[in-house]
């Protein structure tokens, strides 16, 4: 039984909403509540690991647990990205390069172990563990890359959002799931 949702249009809508919640949630805890990035990372890493433990224990896809794990990942990923840039002072460029390296390493180990990187067929504990590690790094990279594009490249948030939306929409237009039975 697949342990993650099939990627359909509704998935992308929920993903965007959850990622937006992650971005604003991380900023709310780190800046508005003045907890700082370290405390926010600590709190939400524990929450992420708790939901992930439940998710892995279930051995099946459960929408509530999946999206709670996803959202906690988005919050901790955003806080990590901001920590790398602002607290460590590495900036968006170096932070993005580090995260790309980490993501490529995780994907390489995942492929070596599972002989596949398909998210359409996550059926084992090991595959799902790699999925969530890659997912957390990708969330962190997404925040860093978005900030890099908007700030470091100087194109601004509106153009960056339009560019990324266009790329996503062109991908969705050409996407054909392996299994037509879809759920989120």
Q: Where is each model-derived feature located?
A:
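Polytopic alpha-helical membrane proteins, predominantly small-molecule transporters/carriers
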Residues: 1-184
């Amino acid at each position: 039984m697949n342990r993650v949702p099939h990627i359909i249009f509704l998935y992308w809508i929920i993903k965007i909403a959850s990622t937006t919640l992650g971005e604003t949630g991380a900023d709310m805890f780190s800046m508005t509540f003045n907890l700082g990035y370290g405390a926010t990372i600590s709190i939400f890493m524990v929450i992420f690991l708790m939901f992930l433990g439940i998710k892995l224990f279930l051995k099946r896809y459960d929408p509530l647990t999946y999206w709670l794990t996803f959202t906690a990942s988005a919050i901790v990923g955003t806080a990590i990205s901001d920590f790398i840039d602002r607290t460590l002072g590495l900036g968006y460029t170096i932070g993005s390069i580090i995260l790309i390296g980490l993501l490529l390493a995780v994907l390489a180990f995942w492929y070596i172990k599972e002989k596949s990187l398909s998210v359409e067929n996550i059926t084992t504990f090991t595959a799902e563990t790699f999925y969530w590690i890659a997912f957390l790094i990708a969330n962190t990279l997404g925040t860093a890359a978005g900030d890099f594009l908007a700030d470091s490249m100087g194109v601004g948030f509106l153009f960056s959002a339009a560019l990324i939306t266009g790329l996503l929409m062109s991908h969705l237009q050409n996407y054909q799931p392996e299994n037509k039975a879809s759920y989120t």
